[in-house]
Amino acid sequence: MRRAGAIAAFLILAAATVSVAPQPVLAPLAAPEPAPAKAIPSLGQVHRVFVIVMENLGYRAAMAVPALRSLAERYASASQYYATTHPSLPNYISLTSGGTYGITTDCWYCQLAVPNLGQELSAQGITWGAYMQGLPAACWLGPWWPPGDYAGKHDPFRYYTDIVTSPALCQHIQPLRALRARLAGPPSAVPRFVWITPNLCNDGHDCPAVQAAAWLAGEVAAITASPAWKDGGFLVVTWDEGNGADRRGVDAAGQVVPTGGGGHVLTLVISPLVTPGLVIATPLDHLSLLKTVEEIFNLPKLGATGQASVADFSAFLKPPH
């Protein structure tokens, strides 16, 4: 049984898409950056979180790609991290809401009226941005954009009704190019939570893993060169799901089980606050990543992340001075 099974389902299926009229690329950040209270001292060192989600690659296959193995050896990694389920979309939903809420396909028309990460970050005054490579304009909500190789099923934020029906919240969904200038500026120019979805080639969905790894290495280099990352940055790279035949996952007791999950995937932790080369073997999954973000920013727990059996990423961090 997956952890998501412990959550009540609140799925609303819409019969049509939300309006997809392009809007200007503009997402002003709030000037102040409040320092939230932290319940876990090691996580309290983190000032800014970056998350990159790649596509469809099992752990063993990922570690066989030289560029990915190099990143794992240079930074830190989780050797027992598991996706939620198959196919893609419910993994993205669990990463941002703590459950799958009845979604079992890559439906482009689904809408969810459930608490979610974007909503909670905004409610707490935490700046955030969801950056989608290939997205034609801010708050563009169409299911596909072939010229940019963009797929809406890899943007979880477009599925939450409170985000897509709010002009202010929807403006947090941005083309990836909008992040470039921010990274070149001071830390305050970059949102405190940054989500990055590559296009269908660079995430490895439609192109070879070697090509996706080359893109990822370049993106990691750009982020780690930025003042924002150097100032207590915490970058996590994970894969939405593993090999389709791999059904391993983490159950409600926090143990690895052979069925009910989305497979064994590589997860990288890249931060100046982490010991290089560290490998953590604690069973972790997408709920663990969401729980870690919640604890860093002192957010209410979403879905199943409130369960004590869900481990977080605090073991990756050096003890605070």
Predicted regions and their residues:
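Secretory targeting and sorting signals
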Residues: 2-25
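N-terminal start-of-domain structural block
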Residues: 1-3, 121-122
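N-terminal pro-sequences and low-complexity stem/linker regions of secreted or lumenal proteins
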Residues: 25-321
